[in-house]
Every structure is written in structure tokens, then in C-alpha cells.
């Protein structure tokens, strides 16, 4: 086996021409499984590039010859496979489908799975997403405002030619491109959690499942709940918050929280968080010693990674630049 060194962003690439070794790599990154070579064993090779961000593992998997893969129940995870080229004959429990670049396969956590593919003489990589079961069910619970007791029953076919399907695929493909970057933004600690939640939320909207209809039943939050949410944003502004986290902590669904913010404040929870962070950054700038702290350090402390954009929005909000505020009041 050859293994590329960690690229500095948590991404690793594995290359193996040994069947047992390839099985061990896949089992370690994803799930215990069996691999049966249907094509020419003499040219067998497995290549995998993968990284985890929060509760999501995203990888590109390719074999040099046709194989068949079997797993038992995934138990602690849900899974999605998207062939970037060619076809993947696959099943989850009794359900069967042929996954293509236009149709992803979604796997339940409580069913056995099988895959058969990679017969093409050309590279046919598959985007493989492993999603932590608890994280996805918590995400759904936050949006519904009620606990998820039973496993989510997904339909196996996810149409990637619908509007939401294409948009979700674009998000996944964008993340997959970042696997090759040593400075992948999606794997930055302050970005990875919201990015993973965005991907999970998108899947819940794009895929067919037994809770999907309930996602479109808004129940407006009370102003008191909005107040609690604003207090929570104030107290945790330095953390990489998401709407789902805020909704969960104040006990309402994401949709209810969004409606409540729009009705009460005329904005969204995340825009309100940005305002709070901007105000806290200004407070730090006015109190800072320019000799020991700069605009960049303070901006990044409050989650503004693009300092130039921060400076522009700061001036638009307060009428002065961050550097002007940094020099305004002597260090106290």
C-alpha cells in the first residue's frame, strides 16, 4: 500500500493493489465489508481519497476492475453514493437501483447493502458520503421540533436532475474538490461544522424519506423564544454556531426559529449572529493595544476569516474602518 502523507487538512489518499489491504482500508474509513473481485484480479487496484469534517466523511473511491461489495447493517451511519462516471448497481435491504451521475443511491442505517461496479476500463470514481446517524437525526429533530425515535426511512433513489438535487450535488462536488487542497476552507474548524450541517440539511430536503412532508409545516416561534435565541447567540458568538444548534438549545424547530426572527426582527438567526460578532469585534478593537493586537487577529477571533471583506462590511456598518477604531482609543 502507498499512503500519501496528511496534506495538512486531514485528507489522506490510499492506493493498494492487495485485496485484503484494500478491504481493511475501506473498513477503517467507512464500514466493515467484504470485497469480491469480478474482473481481472491481476490488475486490481483501489484508490481512496477521504477526509472527515464533523459528522460527515467524504471520499472518492475508485477500483481498477469490477468488484462487488457487501456490508451488514450500517447501524450508526447513513450513506450516499454518487458515481461521477458510469453506473453502480446497488441495493439497500430489498431495494435496488442503478446509481449514475444523475441518480444518487441513499442507504438506510438499518439495512444491509451491496454494490457492484467499476467494470469500465476508464476511471469511474464514486463520491461516498458517510453521515453519522445521531448527527443527521438530531439535525432532523431540530427542524421538526420533536425527537426522532425510529431510523429515517430513505427512498433509495435521489434524483440529481431536480433543482434541489442539482444544488445539493453542487455542494458535494465543491467539497470533493477541496479534498485536493492543503488549505481546504471546508475543513477549517470554524467552517467544517456549519458546512456538514448544510450538507445534512440539504440531504433531508432533497431526498425522499418518511419525515420529508413535515419539514414544510412552519410553526412560528414566540417572541420569547426569539429573545432566548438572541441571548444564546450573544453568549456563544465565538463558537461555530449553526441554526440547528440554536434551535435545539431553545427548544423549537429551525423553521419556527427562522419565522420568529423574520417576524420579530426582520432578519435571520445567522444574520443576527453576524451583527453580534461585528459588534463584539468593534468592542475588542476599541479596547485593543495596537502594538500587541491587529485587525486580522481580532477579526478572525470572531469568525471573520476574509479580513478584506470584514473591513468593508465593518465600515459600511459603523462608518469607520477597523484600523481607525483600533487607533481611536488608547489601550486601557
Curated annotation (Swiss-Prot):
Keyword hit for Transcription regulation: yes
Domain HTH araC/xylS-type as annotated: residue spans: 227-328
UniProt cross-references to SUPFAM superfamilies, sorted A to Z: Homeodomain-like (SSF46689)
Keywords: DNA-binding, Transcription, Transcription regulation
Protein purpose: Probably involved in the positive regulation of the thc operon for the degradation of the thiocarbamate herbicide EPTC.
Originating organism: Rhodococcus erythropolis
The name this protein goes by in its record: Probable thc operon regulatory protein
DNA-binding region, residues: 244-265, 295-318
GO molecular function: DNA-binding transcription factor activity; sequence-specific DNA binding
Amino acid at each position: 500500500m502507498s499512503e500519501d502523507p496528511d496534506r495538512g487538512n486531514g485528507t489522506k489518499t490510499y492506493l493498494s493493489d492487495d485485496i485484503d489491504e484494500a478491504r481493511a482500508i475501506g473498513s477503517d474509513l467507512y464500514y466493515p465489508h467484504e470485497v469480491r473481485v469480478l474482473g481481472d484480479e491481476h490488475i486490481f487496484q483501489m484508490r481512496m481519497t477521504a477526509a472527515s469534517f464533523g459528522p460527515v466523511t467524504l471520499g472518492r473511491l475508485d477500483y481498477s476492475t469490477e468488484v462487488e461489495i457487501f456490508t451488514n447493517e450500517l447501524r450508526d451511519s447513513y450513506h450516499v453514493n454518487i458515481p461521477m462516471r458510469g453506473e453502480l448497481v446497488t441495493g439497500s435491504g430489498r431495494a435496488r437501483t442503478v446509481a449514475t451521475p444523475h441518480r444518487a443511491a441513499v442507504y438506510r442505517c438499518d439495512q444491509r447493502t451491496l454494490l457492484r461496479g467499476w467494470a469500465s476500463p476508464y476511471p469511474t470514481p464514486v463520491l461516498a458520503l458517510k453521515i453519522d446517524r445521531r448527527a443527521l437525526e438530531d439535525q432532523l429533530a431540530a427542524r421538526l421540533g420533536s425527537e426522532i425515535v425510529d431510523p429515517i426511512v430513505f427512498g433509495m433513489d435521489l434524483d440529481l436532475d431536480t433543482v434541489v438535487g442539482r444544488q445539493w450535488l453542487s455542494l458535494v462536488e465543491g467539497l470533493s474538490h477541496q479534498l485536493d487542497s492543503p488549505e481546504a476552507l471546508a475543513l477549517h474548524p470554524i467552517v467544517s461544522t456549519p458546512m456538514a450541517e448544510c450538507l445534512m440539511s440539504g440531504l433531508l430536503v432533497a431526498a425522499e424519506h418518511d419525515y420529508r412532508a413535515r419539514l414544510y409545516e412552519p410553526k412560528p416561534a414566540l417572541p420569547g423564544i426569539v429573545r432566548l435565541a438572541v441571548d444564546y447567540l450573544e453568549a456563544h458568538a465565538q463558537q461555530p454556531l449553526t441554526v440547528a444548534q440554536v434551535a435545539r438549545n431553545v427548544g423549537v424547530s429551525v423553521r419556527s426559529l427562522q419565522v420568529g426572527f423574520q417576524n420579530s426582527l426582520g432578519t435571520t438567526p445567522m444574520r443576527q449572529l453576524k451583527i453580534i460578532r461585528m459588534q463584539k469585534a468593534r468592542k475588542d478593537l476599541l479596547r485593543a493595544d495596537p502594538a500587541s493586537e491587529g485587525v486580522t487577529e481580532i477579526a478572525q477571533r470572531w469568525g471573520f476569516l476574509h479580513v478584506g471583506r470584514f473591513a468593508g462590511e465593518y465600515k459600511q456598518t459603523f462608518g469607520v474602518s477597523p484600523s481607525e477604531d483600533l487607533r481611536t482609543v488608547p489601550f486601557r
